[in-house]
Amino acid sequence: MSKMEKEPLFSAKNLKYLTGPFSANNPVIVQILGICSALAVTVQLKPAIVMALSVTVVTAFSNLVMSLLRNGVPSRIRIIVQLVVIAALVILVDQVLKAFVYEVSKQLSVYVGLIITNCIVMGRIEAFALANKPWASFLDGIGNGLGYGLILVIVAFFRELFGSGSLLGYRISPESGYMAEGGFYSNCGLMLFPPMALIIVGCIIWVHRSRNKDLQEK
């Protein structure tokens, strides 16, 4: 009797779990999840990148742990177990940030702790990890975390560039070009206000849906 062939770790099916959230199933611009942090942490690019990586780590490993435990956790207490797993991972991530990137950790402040309530993390556990194998769940978590992070980075790129004239804290716009120095340019202070994050996300959604007819409402 021939043995069943094992599915490759990076089969086409598994790669779809990893790459799908970048476009067709993006948690922010398709599922409209995680919008609050898009407002809070995208004034500068560095905090946005750190937040994106933090959410990716938490989503990936919470998916993995809950997939491993899925057959041993009674349905009536699954939400409590999920919250405990997510909270433990968030605390670990928070301590790592304080140890290695303390200044960015101070900028993110309470928003790292609020990853516990991020609907993307809990949503992927409920929708995917509890019904799929650990490896697929891990890839799904990475994909959704990076898909979420991609939008944060895009929003932060435009807000920091046009709002502060810098990227990653390094000045891009030359001093001589500013009005105060006799030039013609001035930073757009409106980009630093939270509503601009919503407007930029709205523009991204518009561009994305205009290029993907399957997402357009009939």
Describe these PLM feature segments.
Residues 8, 207-218:
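Membrane-interface capping segments at transmembrane-helix boundaries
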Residues 20, 67-71, 75, 136-144:
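Short amphipathic alpha-helical coupling elements at transmembrane boundaries
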Residues 35-39, 55-60, 87-94, 116-120, ...:
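Hydrophobic core segments of alpha-helical transmembrane domains in multi-pass membrane transport
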Residues 45-61, 81, 105-116:
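Structural signature of hydrophobic alpha-helical transmembrane segments
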Residues 62-75, 122-132:
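C-terminal ends of transmembrane helices
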Residues 73-86, 107-113, 140:
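Cytoplasmic-side transmembrane-helix entry/capping segments in multi-pass membrane proteins
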Residues 92-107:
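Transmembrane alpha-helix boundary signature
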Residues 168-190:
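Short, membrane-exposed interhelical loops at transmembrane-helix boundaries
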